Structure formats: structure tokens, C-alpha cells
């Protein structure tokens, strides 16, 4: 078993100011998006669409607003609505954590629609350009989660090579033991807990880095190297992220205040299903639209 290093969540101390790793990872993610965007400007078909470096800079302004506002509101509404309705001022305590990817996704989508309207472009043309810029930012965010030792995975077999002990999960581990006697006996977890006061878990943050971040980036980046029907790149992002997140959620510990919902699925999985379905529908629409336009021009 591997013991999580339990990093200091503060990366840099500047007198009374503290720069946290999680915030730093957001910065890394936005920088990565800019770099990927500038690389995409070199593609002939992208340049022919009139994209410029200034467009990328302006997109990032909209993207930051959409990510932060959408991510926070998504967490408030999707995950802890009852709490925040009772404590409305706590909505603004972003330093205490609480961001939702699905909320951030909706926020960025609306922000890109606004950007498209101002630039007189079709919003799908904008999201097609942006989609390959997103996954490395997601990977950076999940790395921030791992450094913080949060959003850990479900309890697993201690003999598994990926099994990891998370000091931050001690209280959850103690509460987990009496609820799962069969697994405790099967995996000899009582002995493990007696020795470490922790239980082995999936490092699900690393799985998300690999699937939602690195793998999805290469799939989108390679797919977007050639001209595709409008909406196809955006559709592939929806399908790819939705499938990756849905899969990883089987190894990720559900939020303790929600648990598993209908059909034994987590909130993250239920929110990912519409993304997958919308992506499939959009992909079919994109290619049928191109075929119809080609037939009309023939």
C-alpha cells in the first residue's frame, strides 16, 4: 500500500498571503489552455476561420468567469442546495472549497455563447475551437485535488498495487468499517485499520487525470487536427468526458452528504449521462448536416 504524502495545501507563503496548490492548479490549467489554443492557431483550417491570439486571450477572460461562477453555482445547486438555501451567505465562501465540473461546464458554455454573439460567430464554432483546450486544465484541477488529499476513491483491496492510504479520510474510514462487514472480513481490513488507522482506497483523482485529462486531450487534439463538421469536436468532448467521468465514478467515493442515488449511481454519474446522450445526438446531427449540405450543393 502507498501512503498519500499529505502535502501542505499551501504552495507558497508570501507573508500573510498563502498561495494554495489548488488555486495554483487553476492557473496552470488556464495557461495550458492558452498554449494548446496557440498551437491550434497553426492549423491551416483553423487559421482560415480567422482565429487570432487575441481571440484566445479574450476567450480565457470569459472562460475564467464561466468556470468560477458556474463551478460554484453548480456545486451549490447540484450537491448542497438545502444547506446553502439555509445559509445563503456561505455561497460566497469559495475559499472553503466546493466546485462542480458540471456547473463549470454549463458556465463556460454560456460564456462561450456570449463570446460567439459578440464576435458574430456560431457558438458551436467557438466550442469546437475551445474543446481541445479544456482537458489539460481538468487534469491540473484533479492534480490539485490529489495534492490536497481530497475527493479520494472508494475502499479497495489492500493487496491491489494502486491501493492508497489517505490521512484525510481517517474519520470516513472509521465510519465505513461497521457498515461493510463482508468486505472487512474478505480483505482483512480490521487488521489494516488497526495498524494504520486508515483504509486503502482508490486514488481516483489519478484515474481522472489519466482519463478526463491526458487521454481525452490526445483524443480531441488528434481528432481536431483535420476539419470536422461543425459541432463534431464539441460532441466528442461531451461523449469523451461523460464516459470517462461515468467510469471513474465507480472508483470514486460518493459525497457523504449525498451517497449513491437511484440505480446505485452517484450524482456525478447522473450528471454525466445527459452529456453522453447530448454528445451522441450532436455528433449524429453534425455529420448528417454536412451530408445534407453536400447533397444540396451537388
From Swiss-Prot:
Any GO BP: lipoprotein biosynthetic process
Predominant location category: membrane
Binding site for a 1,2-diacyl-sn-glycero-3-phospho-(1'-sn-glycerol): 142
Pathway(s) per entry: Protein modification; lipoprotein biosynthesis (diacylglyceryl transfer)
Entry EC no(s): 2.5.1.145
Matches recorded under InterPro entries: Lgt
TM regions (residue ranges): 17-37, 59-79, 97-117, 129-149, 204-224, 230-250, 257-277
GO cellular component terms given for this protein: plasma membrane
Keyword tags: Cell inner membrane, Cell membrane, Membrane, Transferase, Transmembrane, Transmembrane helix
Protein's cellular compartments: Cell inner membrane
Record carries keyword Nucleus: no
Record's bilayer topology term: Multi-pass membrane protein
The family this protein is said to belong to: Belongs to the Lgt family.
PANTHER family in the cross-refs: PHOSPHATIDYLGLYCEROL--PROLIPOPROTEIN DIACYLGLYCERYL TRANSFERASE (PTHR30589:SF0), PROLIPOPROTEIN DIACYLGLYCERYL TRANSFERASE (PTHR30589)
Job of this protein: Catalyzes the transfer of the diacylglyceryl group from phosphatidylglycerol to the sulfhydryl group of the N-terminal cysteine of a prolipoprotein, the first step in the formation of mature lipoproteins.
Protein name according to UniProt: Phosphatidylglycerol--prolipoprotein diacylglyceryl transferase
